[in-house]
Design a protein with these regions (language model features):
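Gly/Ser/Thr-rich phosphate-binding loop
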Residues: 187, 212-217, 226-287, 300, ...
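Conserved AMP-binding/adenylate-forming
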Residues: 1-47, 377
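Conserved AMP-binding/adenylation subdomain of ANL enzymes
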Residues: 148-165, 173-214, 224, 228
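Structural core segment of the AMP-binding/adenylate-forming
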Residues: 3-4, 32-104, 418
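AMP-binding/adenylate-forming catalytic core of the ANL superfamily
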Residues: 14, 43-50, 60-62, 215, ...
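Conserved pre-ATP/AMP-binding loop-to-beta segment of ANL
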Residues: 90, 95, 107-129, 136, ...
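Conserved AMP-binding A3 loop
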Residues: 125-149
Length: 480
């Protein structure tokens, strides 16, 4: 990187699956003081152009081949839209780099650093992009001290040591994978087992073969494993616990884990403050089943009302956290930062919760207008903006509908421009595909209605649509 003109503080973006090359690039950034910007493998041209320009990335690493696509070839024609990007590097794990510089060539042509490059703990270490209520991805800025505080507290609470073997099925461009799958094992000298493409069979095989002691991920991962275990028993005696976050754990899943002797723990946090509430390993089962843990070491949690005044135990309000793990702000977004962070260092999550007398919290809902699909945030507004570009659609609103496996899926209510028009889910999927956005953002259910319910001031009454989709799903179950 240094030979390519990269300096301390420059942003280095890398869009890689769970490969060892991800770790190599991350460590290289740490060694020279560059800022890591890991990106989700599912992102396509639209998201990539936005994010690379937003963070002003100077170097971008992507696979030459992954899942029958050639990510490097997707970005090369878009260089004229990326004025800050100086170098595109093909990670030639599965296919040679024919149109760009290759990572293997960089490694072959260069020697290890001879002079140490030092950085301050409060300097920027990483920018993790997350979707939220504002639509386009936001860059969460984390310092070296943020990351160290987060992962040290996390490892201490769960008694993780060098003897543990982490299984990480989540994408490394997500906070879960980046922090808990890669960074935490570095800090304690543990081993990490990564998956580039998650399938229940591959994950179960690795859990058994590698004698993994802990697994981390969203509810769908454990849901799929439980389904497979019914047909294909496996020796998971080494597994100490499965840590689940990103969405509510269904009671059915928790009960099945209990019956199989798998300790299922809940963790709560966000990219901005990750993770800051975890249960204790020796807590009673009721804590695992009915709470999302209590504040990690060095972290404070409070529940506030609409005026951000602290509420007493048992009252529902917005969850807020403060501590050395809390991010320094959103990249180049001062207004969003000022709204999320106050002058005293409190981060207001937009999530609703209750806290009991012992300090344990339970997340009860969200103020934020997002859909959590298998642990991934989908901005309703972003999906709505794309729907409104469809030539047949006059008005649109996207809400979450419950899903047993993923927690939530997106449901689009649309008003057509002409009454005689028709619109199918297949039509919408084809339209989103042409827009080159990530597949997990596609609407998965379409309801065509005459008009959207609105207040007198013109705001859409989403709660009525959420109620409507629940009734429709219940009716479908009755008819089935």
């Amino acid at each position: 990187m240094l030979t390519k003109g990269i300096e301390s503080g420059d942003r280095i973006a890398f869009q890689l699956p769970g490969w060892c090359e991800f770790t190599v690039i991350y460590l290289a950034c740490l060694k020279i003081g560059a800022v890591s910007v890991p990106l989700l493998p599912s992102w396509r041209e639209a998201e990539l152009v936005w994010v690379l320009n937003k963070c002003q990335a100077k170097m971008f690493f992507a696979p030459t081949l992954f899942k029958q696509t050639r990510p490097v070839d997707l970005i090369l024609p878009l260089q004229n839209q990326l004025p800050q990007l100086q170098q595109i590097v093909g990670v030639d794990k599965l296919a040679p780099a024919t149109s760009s510089l290759s990572l293997s060539q960089i490694l072959a042509d260069n020697t290890p650093l001879t002079t140490a490059i030092t950085t301050h703990g409060d300097e920027l270490a990483a920018v993790l992009f997350t979707s939220g209520t504002e639509g386009l991805p936001k860059g969460v800025m984390l310092t070296h001290n943020n990351i160290l505080a987060s992962e040290r507290a996390y490892c201490a609470r769960l008694n993780l040591t060098w003897q543990d073997v982490f299984m990480m099925p989540a994408p490394l461009g997500h906070a879960t994978g980046f922090l808990h799958g890669v960074t935490a094992p570095f800090l304690i000298g543990a081993r990490s087992v990564l998956l580039d493409i998650f399938t229940p069979a591959a994950c179960l095989a690795l859990l058994e073969q590698q004698r993994c002691t802990c697994m981390l991920g969203a509810t769908p991962f454990v849901y799929d494993l439980l389904n497979l275990l019914e047909k294909q028993p496996a020796d998971l005696s080494a597994l100490r616990f499965f840590l689940c976050g990103g969405t509510t754990i269904p009671k059915k899943v928790a009960r099945e884990c209990q019956q199989r002797g798998i300790k299922l723990l809940s963790v709560y946090g966000s990219t901005e403050s990750s993770p800051h509430a975890v249960v204790n390993l020796d807590d009673p089962l009721s804590r695992f089943m009915h709470t999302d843990g209590y504040a990690a070491a060095g972290v404070e949690i409070k529940v506030v009302d609409g005026a951000r005044k602290t509420l007493p135990p048992g009252c529902e309000g917005e969850e807020a956290s403060r501590g050395p793990n809390v991010f320094m702000g959103y990249f180049d977004e001062p207004e969003l930062t000022a709204h999320a962070l106050d002058e005293e260092g409190w981060y207001y999550s937009g999530d609703l919760c209750r806290m009991d007398e012992a300090g344990y919290i339970k997340i009860t809902g969200r103020k934020k207008d997002i859909i959590v699909r298998g642990g991934e945030n989908i901005s309703s507004r972003e999906v709505e903006d794309i729907l409104l570009q469809h030539p047949k659609i006059h008005d649109a609103c996207v809400v979450a509908m419950p899903d047993e496996r993923l927690g939530e899926r997106s449901c689009a209510y649309v008003v057509l421009k002409a009454p005689h028009h028709s619109l199918s889910l297949e039509d919408v999927v084809a339209f989103f595909s042409r827009k080159r956005v990530a597949k997990y953002k596609y609407p998965e259910h379409i309801v065509v209605i005459e008009k959207l319910p609105r207040t007198a001031s013109g705001k859409i009454q989403k709660f009525l649509l959420r109620k409507d989709i629940l009734q429709r799903l219940e009716q479908t179950c009755v008819e089935a």
